[in-house]
UniProtKB/Swiss-Prot annotation:
It comes from Oxybasis rubra. PANTHER family: 60S ACIDIC RIBOSOMAL PROTEIN P0 (PTHR45699), LARGE RIBOSOMAL SUBUNIT PROTEIN UL10 (PTHR45699:SF3). GO terms for cellular component: cytosolic large ribosomal subunit. It comes from the Eukaryota. Coiled coil: none annotated. It holds the Pfam family Ribosomal_L10. The keyword Electron transport does not apply. Keywords: Phosphoprotein, Ribonucleoprotein, Ribosomal protein. This is Large ribosomal subunit protein uL10. Phosphorylated.
Length: 321
């Protein structure tokens, strides 16, 4: 006959298992387990078998084990896990892709009836339509101020009604009506509340971000930095091409301002081309990977210029009367 371990021995074994998992796994999903049954939890364990382990336990025992293990190993990052604990918490240690593990967990959520006294996790709306109940059941609807009518010997709900709001407790009348209608409005399972990844802690919403989302946010950040740099005249790499272009344009305009009114139309056209080439060259220098690209762009620009006037019409002769 096997000897049953004592409570102290169970606590020691649990502590050793938790410490071993903390050393072996660098990724932990912290999940709430409200209203999750043992059969449902067993199904989740089977579904995650291979690269993930689900560990449940009392909060006080888990916090104590993590705190002592962090002190013994000198890994203070583990204290971040301790601060994320909620009532009825579960730890999911994994070596797989965090997003895939979370999706696998969500598959095991099951529908549940609205029992009296439960706090509603979502808004419960009763849809319009025929209920299939006989007219003697109208008292349930009248108590809850649900508009109904009798249609072909059955009770029909006229308009949709918000029966229970999120965060409210389910009353006896609401629970009885939903049971008669066969509505199971709630679903329960492990809900990932926080993510621990090698010392970093973040919200599970981060797992929903795609590469396109990251690129869009990066582009927005660069645009904001560029605008701010230009506004306060502070040099940054992002604003360098724009600053160079604006600087070259302003410099030429300042030089030409005293004689601008006396220039001939042909010389004004030459000035416009010079400003355009300067702007294009500065922009190319800021975006091209090497200097050769800017030079090639300048040469190509030169080739495309129509030879309308001689060399005497451009250059320093612009400042002559």
């Amino acid at each position: 006959m096997a000897v049953k371990p004592t409570k102290a021995e169970k606590k020691i074994a649990y502590d050793q298992k938790l410490c071993q998992l903390l050393d072996e796994y660098s990724q932990v999903l912290i999940a709430s387990a409200d209203n999750v049954g043992s059969n449902q939890l067993q199904a989740i364990r089977i579904g995650l078998r291979g690269d993930s382990i689900v560990l449940m336990g009392k909060n006080t025992m888990m916090k104590r084990s993590i705190r002592l293990h962090a002190e013994n190993t000198g890994n203070e990052n583990l204290r971040n896990v301790e601060q994320l604990f909620l009532p009825n918490v579960g730890l999911i240690f994994t070596k797989g892709d965090l997003n895939q593990v979370r999706e696998e967990i969500s598959k095991y959520k099951v529908g549940a009836p609205a029992r009296f006294g439960l706090v509603a996790p979502i808004d419960v709306v009763v849809p319009p339509g025929n209920t299939g109940l006989d007219p003697s059941q109208t008292s349930f609807f009248q108590v809850l101020n649900i508009p109904t009518k009798i249609n072909k010997g059955t009770v029909e709900i006229i308009t949709a009604v918000e029966l229970i709001k999120k965060g409210e407790k389910v009353g006896s009348s609401e629970a009885a009506l939903l049971a008669k209608l066969g509505i199971r409005p709630f679903s329960y399972g492990l809900n990932v509340e926080s993510v621990y990844d090698d010392g970093s802690v973040f919200s599970p919403e981060v797992l929903d971000l795609t590469e396109d989302d990251l690129l869009a946010r990066f582009a927005t950040g660069v645009s904001m930095v560029t605008s701010l740099s230009l506004a306060i005249s502070y040099p940054t790499l992002a604003a360098a091409p724009h600053s160079s272009s604006m600087g070259a344009t302003m410099f030429l305009l300042l030089l030409l301002q005293p004689t601008m009114t006396s220039l001939r139309p042909r010389k004004l056209r030459s000035i416009s081309r010079i400003l355009a080439v300067a702007s294009c060259s500065c922009s190319s220098a800021g975006t091209a990977p090497t200097g050769g690209g800017a030079a090639a762009a300048a040469v190509e620009e030169k080739k495309e210029e129509p030879e309308e006037e001689s060399d005497d019409d451009i250059g320093f002769s612009l400042f002559d009367d």
